[in-house]
A protein has these predicted regions:
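Transmembrane alpha-helix interface/packing and boundary motifs in multi-pass membrane proteins
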Residues: 219-223, 254-263, 295-301, 386, ...
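Conserved, well-structured core domains of diverse proteins
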Residues: 1-130, 136-140
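Long, contiguous bundles of hydrophobic transmembrane helices that form the permeation core
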Residues: 2-35, 327-430, 533-621, 648-666
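Membrane-interfacial loop-to-helix junctions in multi-pass transporters
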Residues: 132-137, 197-211, 237-251, 282-288, ...
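Membrane-water interface regions at transmembrane-helix termini and the short interhelical loops
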Residues: 51-55, 79-95, 123-124, 141-156, ...
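Core transmembrane alpha-helical segments of multi-pass membrane transporters/permeases
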Residues: 148, 153, 163-178, 186-190, ...
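Hydrophobic transmembrane alpha-helices that form the pore/transport pathway of multi-pass ion
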Residues: 232-300, 310, 319, 489-521, ...
Length: 667
C-alpha cells in the first residue's frame, strides 16, 4: 500500500473530540437531537457568563451543573448507536430508537445524580457529616456515565485507566505489600467521588468549571470574529519575502492560535489547511510541512500568556500566582520556537525552496488596516491579566465581551449580533471534551488521594533512581509522554502531576519547576511516536506517512525535549535569579539550541556529514549544562565546525565537484 493511499484512510476529525463534535453538528443539521444539543450548549455558555458576572454558586452546584451540561452534550451528539454494533445495526431504525431512548435515560440520571450530590453536600453539616444512600447512588451513576461518555469521546484509554485506579482502591489489602493499603468498599468510593473535594468535583473540575471554560469561550468568539485569518495574513506579510517565509508563517500563526484554543490537533486542522499546502507548493517535503504545523500547534500550549489551559491548572496545583507561572514559562517557550525556526531555515536551504510570488504576499499595511481591531481584543486580555491583574476568569470574561464591542468597528462586518449565539454554541461543544477529560482525571486523582498511591509510587521511584534527580526526571518524562498518548493534555498533566510531581519536589525541585516539567512532556506527547496525534493530523492534511511526519516533528521540536531538563538544573532559565544570571543562561541556551538544530537538520551554511552532526549535537548539549567550562567547550566546538563549513561554503560548487571526482578516482 502506498503512502498516499494510506493517508487517505486517516480520518483527521476523529483524532480530536472537538473536531468530531463539530463535524457531527455540521452533518446533523435539522436533526432534533443536534438541535437539542445546540440549545444545551447555548444554555451552558449562558450559565457560565452569568456566574462570571454575578458570582459563582456553591462549589457542588457550579461544578455539578458544569459537568451535567457536558455529559448531556456528549449523550446527545455521540449517540450509543455510533459506538456499539455500528456496523451490524447501522441501518436499523429500531436499534437507533432504542439507543436514543437509553441515552435520554442517562441524561435524566445525570441531572438527578448531580442534584443528589449537591443536596448531600448542602445538608452534610446537619447530618453531622454522615452521608445517605443518595450519595452512593449519585456517585455510582456519575462514575458510570462519566466513563461511558469518556469512552465515546476520548476512546478507551482514559476510562480504562480510571477503572484500574478504582480497582486498586477496592483491592488494597490483597495486593503485594509494597503497594498495599487499607482498601475501600465500592459504597465508600462512590460516596467519596460524589461528595468529597478530592473526588469528581475536586480541583480539576473547579478549574474546568471556571477559568478553562471562560478561555474556551474566548477562543470560540475570537475564531468566529475571523481572527485566525488575520493572524495568518500578518504572519505571511512579515515572513513571505524570505525563503523560509511559508514555514515561518506557520510557526507564528499556529503558535499564537494554539495558545488560545489549547488543542494541538484542532489547531493543526484549523491553521494547517492553509499553511501545509502553502509549504508544499514552495518545495518543502510533505512530511516536513506536516511536522512544522504539528510542532508549532503543540507549542501553543506552553506559550504565555494563555498557555492553553495548563497555566490555570498549575495555579490550582502549585498555589502560585498566575503571573509567576507566565514569567517562568517565557524563556522555555521562546527557546522551543527558536529551535523550530532555526530548523525551518536550515531545511529551507536543503530543500531549495522557492520564494513566494510577491502577488501572493499581503501587504502589512493593508492587513493591519483591516485587522487592527483584533489587536485591541488581545490588548484587553493582556491588560486584564498582566497590568490590572484581574483573576484569569474575569480577564477572559472581559476579553470575550470585548469581541462584539470591538468588532462594531469592523468595516467588513465579520462579527455581528447574529454571530453571538453561534459562538456561544461553539463554546459549549468545544468545552465538552475538556470537561469529560477533567472528570475522568478527577476519578484518578480521587483514588490517588484516598489510597496514597502517589506517595507510595513516588518513594518507589526515588529508591529506583537511588535518590538521583536525572533518572527521576527521565522516568517522569517517559511516563508523561505515555500518558499523553491516549489522553487530552489537561488530563495527562493532572494525573501525572498528582502521582509524579510530589516525588520531584521531594528531590529538591521547586513546586512550579516540577509541575512545569510535567506539563511540558504531557504536551509533547502530541508529536511523539508512536501515537502522535498532532503529527497524524498534519500528515492527514499533507497526505504523507504519519510516522515519518511524527519523526520529523520530533526533530523540529527537539528543544522542547531538552529545555525542561535544563530549567530543572538551572532556575535562571525560569527567570529565578539575578539579571546577569538570567541573561547569561538565555544566551547560552539560544546558542545551544541553534547548534543542536544544525546537527539535527544536517545543515550549517553547507550540508553536514554524520560525524559533524553528532559533534554539533554534543556541543549544543554542553551549552545546556550549567557552568562556564561547559559553555566554553560548546562554543569552541561550534566555532571550529563553523569555520570548516565557512570554507566549504566559500568553495561552493567547486568543492562538490572535487569531492565527486575524488570518489570516482577511488572507485
Amino acid at each position: 500500500m502506498s503512502d498516499k493511499k494510506e493517508i487517505k484512510e486517516i480520518d483527521v476529525a476523529s483524532l480530536d473530540s472537538e473536531l468530531a463534535a463539530a463535524r457531527t453538528l455540521e452533518e446533523g443539521k435539522g436533526d432534533k437531537f443536534i438541535m437539542m444539543a445546540s440549545v444545551v450548549a447555548f444554555l451552558m455558555t449562558s450559565f457560565h457568563i452569568y456566574t462570571g458576572f454575578f458570582g459563582l454558586f456553591d462549589y457542588s452546584v457550579q461544578r455539578g451543573v458544569h459537568l451535567g451540561f457536558a455529559l448531556t452534550l456528549i449523550l446527545l451528539t455521540q449517540p450509543l448507536y455510533k459506538h456499539v454494533f455500528k456496523d451490524k445495526f447501522a441501518g436499523s431504525k429500531a436499534f437507533r430508537a432504542a439507543c436514543r431512548t437509553f441515552d435520554m435515560i442517562l441524561v435524566i440520571l445525570t441531572w438527578v445524580s448531580v442534584w443528589m450530590a449537591q443536596d448531600e453536600v448542602h445538608h452534610r453539616p446537619e447530618r453531622l457529616s454522615k452521608t445517605t444512600w443518595m450519595a452512593t447512588f449519585a456517585g455510582a451513576c456519575l462514575v458510570i456515565i462519566v466513563l461511558e461518555c469518556a469512552r465515546r469521546t476520548l476512546g478507551y484509554i482514559m476510562p480504562v485507566l480510571a477503572l484500574i485506579f478504582i480497582a486498586y482502591a477496592l483491592a488494597g489489602p490483597n495486593l503485594p505489600l509494597a503497594i498495599a493499603h487499607r482498601g475501600y468498599s465500592l459504597e465508600r468510593i462512590c460516596k467519596f467521588l460524589a461528595t468529597d473535594l478530592d473526588g469528581l468535583f475536586g480541583t480539576t473540575m473547579s478549574v474546568s468549571a471556571t477559568v478553562i471554560f471562560m478561555f474556551v469561550m474566548f477562543g470560540a468568539f475570537l475564531e468566529a470574529s475571523g481572527c485566525s485569518d488575520f493572524i495568518n495574513d500578518i504572519a505571511i506579510s512579515l515572513t513571505g519575502k524570505i525563503k523560509s517565509g511559508p514555514a515561518l508563517s506557520a510557526v507564528v500563526a499556529s503558535g499564537l492560535m494554539g495558545s488560545i484554543n489549547g488543542s494541538a490537533v484542532a489547531n493543526v486542522v484549523g491553521t494547517g489547511t492553509f499553511t501545509i499546502p502553502l509549504m508544499k507548493s514552495r518545495g518543502y517535503k510533505p512530511q516536513f510541512a506536516g511536522g512544522v504545523e504539528a510542532v508549532a500547534s503543540t507549542g501553543g500550549q506552553i506559550l504565555p500568556p494563555v498557555m492553553g489551559s495548563g497555566a490555570f491548572l498549575m495555579v490550582a496545583f502549585t498555589e502560585q500566582k498566575y503571573i509567576a507561572i507566565v514569567i517562568a514559562a517565557v524563556i522555555p517557550a521562546l527557546l522551543y520556537y527558536w529551535g523550530c525556526a532555526v530548523a525551518v531555515m536550515s531545511q529551507t536551504e536543503i530543500a531549495h525552496v522557492t520564494l513566494m510570488d510577491p502577488k501572493d504576499i499581503p501587504k502589512s499595511r493593508e492587513v493591519m488596516k483591516d485587522g487592527w481591531i483584533y489587536l485591541l481584543i488581545i490588548a484587553v486580555l493582556l491588560y486584564c491579566l498582566l497590568v490590572a491583574q484581574y483573576s484569569p476568569l474575569y480577564s477572559a470574561l472581559w476579553a470575550t465581551c470585548a469581541v462584539p464591542v470591538v468588532m462594531l468597528f469592523d468595516k467588513k462586518k465579520r462579527f455581528t449580533l447574529k454571530t453571538i449565539p453561534s459562538a456561544m454554541v461553539k463554546s459549549g461543544f468545544s468545552a465538552m471534551s475538556i470537561v469529560i477529560g477533567c472528570a475522568c482525571a478527577g476519578i484518578v486523582v480521587g483514588m490517588v488521594s484516598i489510597t496514597g498511591i502517589g506517595v507510595i509510587f513516588g518513594d518507589m521511584m526515588i529508591q529506583a533512581a537511588h535518590g538521583l534527580l536525572f533518572p527521576s526526571l527521565l522516568f517522569t518524562a517517559i511516563t508523561c509522554i505515555v500518558l499523553g498518548m491516549g489522553l487530552p493534555t489537561t488530563a495527562a498533566y493532572v494525573i501525572a502531576a498528582s502521582i509524579l510531581a510530589p516525588s520531584l519536589i521531594k528531590l529538591g525541585l521547586a513546586p512550579l519547576t516540577a509541575h512545569l516539567f510535567v506539563f511540558y512532556f504531557a504536551c509533547l506527547s502530541a508529536i511523539t511516536p508512536p501515537v502522535a496525534l498532532a503529527a497524524y493530523a498534519g500528515a492527514g492534511i499533507a497526505k504523507t506517512n504519519p510516522m515519518t511526519t511524527a519523526v520529523e516533528a520530533c526533530k523540529l521540536g527537539f528543544a522542547g525535549f531538552m529545555v525542561p531538563f535544563a530549567f530543572c538544573y538551572n532556575p535562571a532559565m525560569m527567570m529565578q535569579g539575578s539579571v546577569g544570571e538570567i541573561i547569561s543562561v538565555a544566551i547560552s541556551a539560544i546558542i545551544g539550541v541553534a547548534i543542536m538544530s544544525a546537527g539535527f537538520q544536517g545543515w550549517l551554511l553547507w550540508r553536514l556529514n554524520w560525524l559533524e552532526r553528532i559533534v554539533f549535537i554534543a556541543g549544543g548539549l554542553l551549552m545546556f549544562i550549567p557552568g562556564t567550562l561547559t559553555d566554553i567547550a560548546g562554543l569552541v566546538i561550534a566555532a571550529a565546525l563553523l569555520l570548516v563549513n565557512v570554507k566549504k561554503w566559500e568553495k561552493g560548487p567547486k568543492f562538490i565537484m572535487d569531492k565527486h571526482k575524488a570518489k570516482q578516482e577511488q572507485k
